[in-house]
């Protein structure tokens, strides 16, 4: 069971990443593209992690899904970066 502090930390992390996404979309260059890419997938990852924590009750299944989610996000970040830079 999550403590109040962990829940508050996830809530703040979702709001902070969402707030940083807006200015990085408006500024268009390579460094902000990298930051946008990382922030976007980090925001997606935190959101899906919260959904899994709420609705997947079997711990082993949840851990495997989280591992696969991290691998998926890393692969997609790489492909998006390569698509926009090269």
Swiss-Prot record:
Looking up Gene3D superfamilies in the UniProt record yields: Fumarate reductase/succinate dehydrogenase, transmembrane subunit
**Localization annotation:** Mitochondrion
Q: What UniProt keywords apply to this chain's record, in alphabetical order?
A: Mitochondrion
Q: List the disulfide bonds.
A: none
Query: Where in the sequence is the signal peptide annotated?
Result: none
**What GO cellular component entries does it have?**
mitochondrial inner membrane; respiratory chain complex II (succinate dehydrogenase)
By its UniProt entry, which SUPFAM superfamilies does this protein fall under? Fumarate reductase respiratory complex transmembrane subunits (SSF81343)
- Is Disulfide bond set as a keyword in this record? no
Which domain of life does the UniProt lineage start with?
Eukaryota
Q: Which GO terms describe its biological process?
A: mitochondrial electron transport, succinate to ubiquinone; tricarboxylic acid cycle
What's the name of the protein? Uncharacterized mitochondrial protein ymf17
Organism expressing this protein natively:
Marchantia polymorpha (Common liverwort)
């Amino acid at each position: 069971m999550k403590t109040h502090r962990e829940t508050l930390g996830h809530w703040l992390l979702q709001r902070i990443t969402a707030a940083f996404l807006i200015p990085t979309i408006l500024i268009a260059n390579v460094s902000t593209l990298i930051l946008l890419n990382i922030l976007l997938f980090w925001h997606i990852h935190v959101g899906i992690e919260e959904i899994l924590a709420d609705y997947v009750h079997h711990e082993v299944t949840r851990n495997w899904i989280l591992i696969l989610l991290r691998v998926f996000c890393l692969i997609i970040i790489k492909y998006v970066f390569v698509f926009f830079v090269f």
